[in-house]
Curated annotation (Swiss-Prot):
Residues 206-217, 351-541 are cytoplasmic. This is Chloride channel CLIC-like protein 1. It catalyses: chloride(in) = chloride(out); bromide(in) = bromide(out); nitrate(in) = nitrate(out); fluoride(in) = fluoride(out). GO terms for molecular function: chloride channel activity; identical protein binding. Homomultimers. Interacts with mitochondrial protein PIGBOS1 (via C-terminus); the interaction occurs at the mitochondria-associated endoplasmic reticulum (ER) membrane, a zone of contact between the ER and mitochondrial membranes, but does not appear to play a role in ER-mitochondria tethering and is not affected by ER stress. Interacts with CALR. The lineage of its organism: Eukaryota, Metazoa, Chordata, Craniata, Vertebrata.
């Protein structure tokens, strides 16, 4: 028994020395193969690492060379260890990133990957970062010991809610934050800018409010015209699409060619029934565009109708609700008197508004007064003003050098004209009794109305003197003196200066025969031309 134990011990020692190379070093994790449970042998040997016994007979140079060889072998071993470590590091990290990129491609493939039509596609995703994920990423970046499984799970949980990129997302965020659509905010700011511009530039002071109101109404009507046309077109298009959907069963019936039996049957159907041809309606829907169903006249009619009836509709609706709420608490017997009182109140309001229109005239803006009707004495003055339109301020006798118009004058009109001319001559003689030069008076159309009536400006001139006076002064003078002056005017026009004794019968004759002495302008002008005198100087015209 003892001998057998000794024999087994010797065999174990022998086998131990025989398999010295297969000894497992528990601290060497680089050369350990976990699958086979043995140590991997090094592929290259750069020298003997065993410690050799120092031979005392060797020189120092040989010892130095041996040390350098051993140092070189150790350096190569360290490099090999680093390379193996890097390979293991890369071999462990590559699968992690491969799975991460594969997940990104899978999520993007659900939304659409770039192709020939779309060179680049934008996506949105949320990044979820936890504390454990942050620690694993920091270990990996710093080169510390890390676990591939933990890093893979961390990267897989980072990207969440993968979706396509929405360029209008900021609008929704703006609306969620402020509760208002960005377009409405922009329009309000634009209106405020317009108001500020009107106030700053004082443009509103140059345009009256009633003019602005009319322009706003016109612009609103024009905008509503296009607005209603688009609305009617949309409605017609929707109705057209609905009719096309209803005609879908007739696609095969109306599209195929008919043989002689079907043509015969169609002829009998048309001859014996009043039903419309469904294929005709089908082809009308296919050929006629809905845009031709909405002419501009229809849009204009709808716009005008809405422009007038829509306000009345809301007024009637409000009135009906008011009457309904008023009658709800009133007994049935009192409802009729209340309605009568309301009707009388409305009529009274309308009557009062009609009576207050002249008081509110200034709210309607400036209005031009109608031209005043000309009296008989003003006809010649109006003719002179019309004829003197092209004359200047110094053309005193310009208005008497031609016919003033085609208005016929009666005997009373001629008499009033003669009276006015006599008064003009009298005022000239009173204000300028001596001197060869006669004054020239600016007429009413050369000065403002008030200045021409109150302070006529006198300018010296060689032309005949004519003074414009108001018609009121003409009507206030006595008729006898006017007729006498008219006779004297006739004598002065003929170029003769009679004596005092001869003037009295002429005055009496002028009082009896006013029409004969104050002749028309054409007869006296011809007589003056025959005598060689200027017809302009005749005050009787």
């Amino acid at each position: 028994m003892l001998c057998s134990l000794l024999l087994c011990g010797c065999l174990l020692l022998i086998t131990g020395y025989a398999h010295d190379d297969d000894w497992i070093d528990p601290t060497d994790m680089l050369n350990y193969d976990a699958a086979s449970g043995t140590m991997r042998k090094s592929q290259a040997k750069y020298g003997t690492s065993e410690k050799k016994e120092v031979n005392p007979g060797l020189s120092d140079a040989q010892e130095l060379s041996d040390c350098l060889q051993r140092l070189d072998s150790l350096t190569h071993k360290v490099d090999d260890c680093e390379k193996k470590k890097m390979k293991d590091y890369e071999s462990q990290s590559n699968p992690v990133f491969r799975r991460y990129l594969n997940k990104i491609l899978i999520e993007a493939g659900k939304l659409g990957l770039p192709d020939e039509d779309r060179v680049d596609v934008r996506y949105d995703a949320e990044i979820l970062l936890t504390r454990q994920t942050l620690l694993e990423i920091q270990k990996f970046l710093s080169g510390e010991e890390w676990k591939p499984g933990a890093l893979d799970d961390a990267l897989s949980d980072i990207l969440t809610n993968f979706k396509s990129h929405d360029a209008e997302a900021w609008k929704w965020q703006f609306e969620d934050y402020f509760g208002v659509d960005p377009y409405n905010v922009f329009m309000v700011l634009l209106c405020l800018l317009c108001i500020v511009a009107l106030v700053a530039t004082e443009l509103w002071t140059y345009v009256r409010w009633h003019t602005q109101l009319k322009r706003v109404c016109i612009i609103s009507f024009l905008v509503s015209l296009g607005w209603n046309w688009i609305y009617l077109y949309k409605v017609a298009f929707a109705q057209h699409q609905a009719n096309v959907a209803k005609m879908a069963p007739l696609n095969d019936v109306c599209a195929k060619k008919m043989d002689w039996t079907e043509n015969l049957w169609e002829w009998f159907r048309i001859s014996w029934t009043y039903k419309d041809d469904p294929c005709q309606k089908y082809y009308e829907l296919l050929i006629v565009n809905p845009i031709w169903l909405v002419p501009p006249t229809k849009a204009l009619a709808v716009t005008f109708t809405n422009f007038v009836t829509e306000p009345l509709k809301y007024i009637g609706k409000g009135t009906g609700e008011f009457i309904k709420a008023l009658m709800k608490e009133i007994p049935v017997l009192l409802q009729i008197p209340v309605l009568v009182i309301l009707a009388l109140a409305v009529l009274g309001f309308c009557y009062g508004a009609g009576q207050s229109v002249p008081m509110l005239r200034h709210f309607r803006g400036p209005e031009r007064e109608p031209p005043r009707a000309l009296e008989p004495d003003d006809r010649r003055r109006q003719k002179e003003l019309d004829y003197r339109f092209h004359g200047g301020a110094g053309d005193a006798d310009f208005s008497y050098r031609g016919p003033a118009g085609s208005i016929e004058q009666g005997p009373y009109d001629k008499m009033h004209v003669c009276e006015r001319d006599v008064l003009r001559q009298r005022q000239v003689n009173m204000r300028f009794p001596s001197g060869n030069k006669s004054p020239e008076v600016l007429r009413a159309f050369d000065l403002p109305d008030t200045e021409a009536q109150e302070h006529p400006e006198v300018v010296p001139s060689h032309k005949p003197s004519i003074v414009n006076t108001s018609l009121k002064e003409t009507s206030e003078l006595p008729r006898e003196s006017t007729l006498a002056e008219c006779s004297q005017c006739a004598k002065d026009g003929s170029g003769q200066v009679p004596s005092t004794a001869e003037s009295s019968p002429i005055v009496e004759k002028a009082q009896l025969k006013t029409d004969s002495e104050c002749r028309p302008h054409s007869t006296e002008a011809a007589a003056a031309a025959a005598r060689g005198t200027d017809p302009v100087s005749s005050p009787c015209g």
